[in-house]
Every structure is written in C-alpha cells, then in structure tokens.
C-alpha cells in the first residue's frame, strides 16, 4: 500500500504518474505493461525502418530511377547516417520544449507523412508530379575509353528523394533518441536490474522488427512490387502510432526540464578560452540564487554550477570512449550498403524451379521468385535474437558467478575485433568475385525487373560476414548503449544517449564520404563503364582500407579504455561521480 500511495502523490517536478496505477494490479504490473507497449512500438517502428533501408539500394537502382550503384550506395549511407546524426535534435526538442511523450507522438506523425511521400514516388503519376519526366538515357556505341560515361551526373529525382529521406531520418532519429529513454523511465522505479534487462529486450525487439521486415517486406519489395512493400511500411508506422496513443494511460510522462547544452558550451569555452569574459559572466541562475538561503537554493530547478562542472568532467571522460567507436560504425553500416551491393553481383538462387526453355525476359514472373538479397541480413538478426536471451539468462550469470564477467568497455573491444574480421571476410570474398569477372565468367540474373551480371559465386558465401557483424553488434552496440546510459549523470542521460547515437551516424556519414572520395576519377570505386553495377570497381580494396582504419582505432580504444578504467578505480573520482549521480 505504501508503494501505491507513493504513486498517487503528485510529483514536484510535474511528472505525471499513470492513471491506471491506482487499480488492483498495483504499480509494478503497470510498469511492465508500459514497458511492453514501448517495446511493441519500437518493434513496429524498426520493422518499417528496415523495410526502407534493406532494399533502398535496389529501389534507387531500379528502372524507376536508374541510379548507378555508387549513387545508390552513397544515398543509403547518408540516410542511415542522418537517422543517427539527427538524434540530438529530437532529444533537445524533448528536453526543452515538448517532453518525451509529445516528442515521440509528433515524430511518429512525421514518420507517417514521410513514408507516405516515399510511397507516392513509386507510382508513375506521383513520380511525375514530384520529379517530372525521367530524362532519356542516350544510346551510344560501346566506348573502350576509361572516360566513357554510362549515366548522367545528377541522378533522377535526387532532390525529392533526398528531402523525403531527410524527413524520414529526422523522424526515425527522434523516435530512437526519445523512445529509448522514455522506456527506461517506465521501469526506473523497479531497480537497476530492471533497467539493464529493459535495454537487452529493447535491442531484442529492434531485431524482432527487423526479422518481420526482412522476411515479409523485403521479399514483397524484391519479388512482387515496391508499391505493396511500401504500403505495408506505412501501415506499420500507423499501427505503432495507434498503439502508442492507446497506451497513454499507463505511461509515466515527464515535463521538459531544459537542456544543458548552453552550460556545457559555457564550460568548454571557459576551459579553452579563459580570457573571454563573455563566457565567464554569471548565469541568471547564479544571480537569482545569490540572495537565497541554502535550503531555498536547493529547491531551484536545474543543476547547480558545481553539478554543471562535474557533468562536464564526466563528459570529457566518456566522449573519447564513444568517439573511438566511430570507425566501428563505419564498418557496421556497410551491412546495409556495400554488402547489399556486393550481394546483388553474386549468384542468387531461385526459390522455385524455372523452365530452362523460357526466355530470360519471361523469367521475371511469379514462378521465378528469387531469394531477396536483403535476407542475408537475417544471419545478422538471427544471431542477435538467439544470443541475447542466451547471454542474458545463461552466459552472463555463469561468468558473474565465476567472477569473469567482462566490463562494458572490454565487451566493446571484443565487438571491434568481430567487426574487423567481418570486413576482412567481405574483402576476401570481393577479391575472389573480381577474379571471376576478370575471367569473363558472369551469370546474367534478373532481380525484379533489373538485369545484373553476377559472378558464379553463391550469395551464401556472404553469410560469414553477416554472422560476424551480428556477433560484433552484441558486444559493441549493446554494451555501448548500456555504457552511455549508466556512466552518465542522471541530469545528462538524455544528452549522452543522443551523443552516442549521433556518433554512430558520424560513422555512417564518414563511410559515405569515403565512398564518394574513392569514386573520383582514379579512385578504387570509380567505374564509369558500369551502369548500375560494380564489376569494374575495386571494392575489395575499400573493404581492406576500412579494416585497417578499424584496427588502428581499436588499439587507440584499448589505450583510452584502460585510462578510463584506472580513473574509475581512483577513490576520489568515484566519490565525485557518485555525488553527481545522486
């Protein structure tokens, strides 16, 4: 009864407790119900997101737009990067103006509008309305010169598609940054172990949504039509929005509490440029509290200047750890861009047998469904769906009893190693594929309505690199998320979570920029004689370059992580950190 009475008491901070918590089930049962609703919304939203990203290269490379492989791969990396890079924007709006509940609701509405616009571009009338008529690709005789251009420099409908993808990235990033913390708020009162388990199952729900998307949506997009596939995506977002609104009575919602961005910038300038008097002027909070008694000052909203300084010091310690994860994210996002491009140029088996006497143009009907290339992502997702529960219920408790449980930083280092091995395996496979291409051993295959000249290597050879990147995700991404949330002071958890997602987006954008740089004349990814394929590119060298970058930064990460662990073991540092975290 005491817990129930505590739930009924109004919060001084304006926090709204769930109305239904006064029922006979008690607050603990409703906290789990609220968390389950958040997990379901996340699963549906991720299913929609992966429905867009898994075949975005194929969609842009199709006859609807005729983008070449380099442009399509770069657009996918830019979209993935923006969907993470913009995470602090949604978090800042929630902290300062909207609150997390309203920010998530508006983000889902924007999500619904953006996916609707993307659906419109699939139809001929909608595409002509937004993009105009597609320019004709001039027919030219074969040219042996390396300067022959097979496509126009500006992709068709680029402005419209990039704008739609930007809106979609803004919505997805806002949902990601706010729904994670919003879900943790629902179980915070149940203890630290409940929060840790929530993050594990939150990540599990993400990958369950990916399974749903890859098995159903990706198959429909590749073998039936993008119109039906993207219609399902719009329906998934609409259902997520409906469930989130229906579950409103069981949610704990908190009002906006303000942002510490200005305080952090103030302290940064004080440390870098102490001579700048403007940054050293007293804040309004100091001047307002100067004449107050100590008890009255403690009730002022927002952290004190001492807490600001302590938070800034924590940020200086945590940020280098997260920055050295950026090359890992460069490797990780290849899974949804260049790995897909590589798979389109490997032999993809048919699900059903076809009559060999049927001509090639007639083999694209319903009797010749091909296994979607995006299904290779299932190897990554299946590893996570299987290993996360096993790790949570069996491996971690066993290691804990034996006192061998690695720290979050040690797990992240192990994740970097598996990411390194994944990109090495991809490079070796690409090198082998190019040997078949050099020997003029190619297999023409139709994927949807598009013709690709693939090497006679089975696409199943990509499974090891997807499995390895999936294992790396368990050891790098999940512990990284837990590290960002647990190491941050309570007043900065949202900001540091946003920085974590933002830096992962930086990794995707750096990967896109590296592809663009290597696509310049003379670069490894420069292959103007290839329209829509990569057979004259040297993507194997690109993979090996990423592996080298990952190896160097992994060594740097080990050094930074070692210093961080030694700092945490310092008694004075532990005392100051505990005071900040309350």
From Swiss-Prot:
Its main location: membrane. InterPro entries: MFS_trans_sf, POT_fam, PTR2_symporter_CS. PANTHER family: OLIGOPEPTIDE TRANSPORTER-RELATED. It comes from the Eukaryota. The lineage of its organism: Eukaryota, Metazoa, Chordata, Craniata, Vertebrata. The chain crosses the membrane at residues 33-53, 77-97, 102-122, 155-175, 201-221, 232-252, 312-332, 371-391, 409-429, 466-485, 498-518, 541-561. The gene is Slc15a3. This is Solute carrier family 15 member 3. Residues 1-20 are annotated as: Disordered. It is a multi-pass membrane protein.
